[in-house]
Amino acid sequence: MAYIIGHKEFYGRLFQVTTATLIPRPESETMIELLKELVQLTPPRLLASPRLRLIDVGTGSGCLGITAKLELPELDVTLADISRHALAIATKNSQRLHADTTVLQSDLLINYPFEADFILANLPYVDRSWDTPPELEHEPALALYADDDGLHLIKKIIQQANTGLTPGGHLLLEADTSQLDAISHFALAHGFIETARRGFIICLKRRET
């Protein structure tokens, strides 16, 4: 239905969607709630320095990164996606909602020139062997499916975030609940500790030493 009417509500705001983007889901709003808590807990010494940087990787419609910017204006937000078609929609949503964001075409963090304080990532995590609801057939396969039991891109961004995040920075990922233990174990071996898990969201903190 969202593709027919051309928009979907997320965190109280309407976002344009097309077949180049995933449809925003209520479950993803938990990531915003967790982010707000993390920013609130950020030591004052960091808040006094240049703006905290956030990158929304695999941004799609931009719903996560744009919402983060509107809820937390102090953040410097970049919307990144490998798909230029998705980025065109993210740009439109950002402009329409008056969110001051930067748009970047990038394969995960490859083209991002900074260390981020926060990374949000709702990457493809569906394995093609899973039974999936019929409505997913209309959503872009590039944004849905991944190899390695659905964890290929999630593992890749954990590896990249080991240098792409500031020490003590946070990586927030969305995945199926059945995958969260495997993600946590993989992250532990790559310099991260799990600090929170809520529904489909897992929060990983880069070790400071």
Question: Language-model segments: which ranges?
Answer:
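Conserved Class I SAM-dependent methyltransferase catalytic core
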Residues: 149-206
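Mobile active-site "lid"/loop adjacent to the S-adenosyl-L-methionine
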Residues: 123-153
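Short alpha-helical
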Residues: 23, 84-85, 127, 152, ...
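Generic C-terminal helix-cap and adjacent flexible tail
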Residues: 41-42, 206-209
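Conserved SAM/SAH cofactor-binding pocket of Class I
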Residues: 30-132
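Conserved AdoMet
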Residues: 1-38
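Conserved beta-strand termini and adjacent loop/short-helix elements that scaffold enzyme active sites
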Residues: 18, 104-106, 197
